[in-house]
Amino acid sequence: MKVTSLDGRQLRKMLRKEAAARCVVLDCRPYLAFAASNVRGSLNVNLNSVVLRRARGGAVSARYVLPDEAARARLLQEGGGGVAAVVVLDQGSRHWQKLREESAARVVLTSLLACLPAGPRVYFLKGGYETFYSEYPECCVDVKPISQEKIESERALISQCGKPVVNVSYRPAYDQGGPVEILPFLYLGSAYHASKCEFLANLHITALLNVSRRTSEACATHLHYKWIPVEDSHTADISSHFQEAIDFIDCVREKGGKVLVHCEAGISRSPTICMAYLMKTKQFRLKEAFDYIKQRRSMVSPNFGFMGQLLQYESEILPSTPNPQPPSCQGEAAGSSLIGHLQTLSPDMQGAYCTFPASVLAPVPTHSTVSELSRSPVATATSC
């Protein structure tokens, strides 16, 4: 089986009501772009940067490529479960042959060919989402912010009718649902989840750990609250806060409480803290911690820098298991202090580690004394 290119007109024909059930559309754009606007009925393939680097254009497990369990089970049935076509798209590429090796679309196409050898045909959309949206916007879900004009028109209706107009406000996917349980006392979610007192009450949350740029104490007046200001940037130092975050979570646990860890979207910073907690307290390897959390909140995707810091953290806190260095890593690591770290990594993570930029993998300074911790830019209650 091979990849076949198709244009927007052909995809539109596939998406006709009577044919839509036999077509699966996989959107390989970043999650936030997908959440804002997408082909109606499509699924987002949210491949983590570590998975992409490790794959190097090769195949990965079907659970990464087909995150929706129902769609995955259907496609993996004999004969593709009645699906005739799987269409892969990115932002705007015109030729699948020219896709970069580390691109999500390239990895998805390769993986589909490997896991669906006798199943539905695999297509690549020429021109990507940009072109398709410009030609057939009626086939897309376009989420736009509420404009000032719309607000004014609603106010006018209120004044004319004497009663408010029901406004169904849109919430992006990362704010939908509620916080997810990582452990019986540890929950993960977004800033929106943390602001909804009914969510917190229903889950018996007693503490909030906010890992974002802005402090928000909407529901914090009756909860234990800790704020760790961290930018979602590959240059941000989040590892220096691992231990204080772990101590706060443990303090809540020891008192029989429950803590919600959140950032803005619950995609990068707060999952990083939860992974560090699992690695420290449950002795999970990074891959195990990532998969464990991904199964519970599918859109998690820590940035390059945070994954690099987690890899370094793994080598510091978990028993080292010396392994021979892969030849491909020797050149990059030559003369570098990273050799010691590389030898302690589990074999399936060594390839991913070697592909990180040196600037990301440079040792991150950590606080080692109580006096140093007191100088960190953390706003927190005096106790947990």
UniProtKB/Swiss-Prot annotation:
SUPFAM superfamilies: (Phosphotyrosine protein) phosphatases II (SSF52799), Rhodanese/Cell cycle control phosphatase (SSF52821). GO terms for biological process: dephosphorylation; endoderm formation; ERK1 and ERK2 cascade; MAPK cascade; negative regulation of MAPK cascade; peptidyl-threonine dephosphorylation; peptidyl-tyrosine dephosphorylation; protein dephosphorylation. It catalyses: O-phospho-L-tyrosyl-[protein] + H2O = L-tyrosyl-[protein] + phosphate; O-phospho-L-seryl-[protein] + H2O = L-seryl-[protein] + phosphate; O-phospho-L-threonyl-[protein] + H2O = L-threonyl-[protein] + phosphate. Disulfide bonds: none annotated. Pfam families: DSPc, Rhodanese. It is an enzyme of class 3 (hydrolase). A motif (Nuclear localization signal) lies at residues 53-74. One of its GO terms (molecular function) is phosphoprotein phosphatase activity. Its EC number is 3.1.3.16, 3.1.3.48. CDD domains: DSP_DUSP5, DSP_MapKP. Residues 19-141 form the Rhodanese domain. It is found in: Nucleus. InterPro entries: Dual-sp_phosphatase_cat-dom, MKP, Prot-tyrosine_phosphatase-like, Rhodanese-like_dom, Rhodanese-like_dom_sf, Tyr_Pase_AS, Tyr_Pase_cat, Tyr_Pase_dom. One of its GO terms (cellular component) is cytoplasm. The active site is at residue 263. It comes from the Eukaryota. Its main location: nucleus. PANTHER family: DUAL SPECIFICITY PROTEIN PHOSPHATASE (PTHR10159), DUAL SPECIFICITY PROTEIN PHOSPHATASE 5 (PTHR10159:SF40). Belongs to the protein-tyrosine phosphatase family. Non-receptor class dual specificity subfamily. This is Dual specificity protein phosphatase 5. It comes from Homo sapiens.
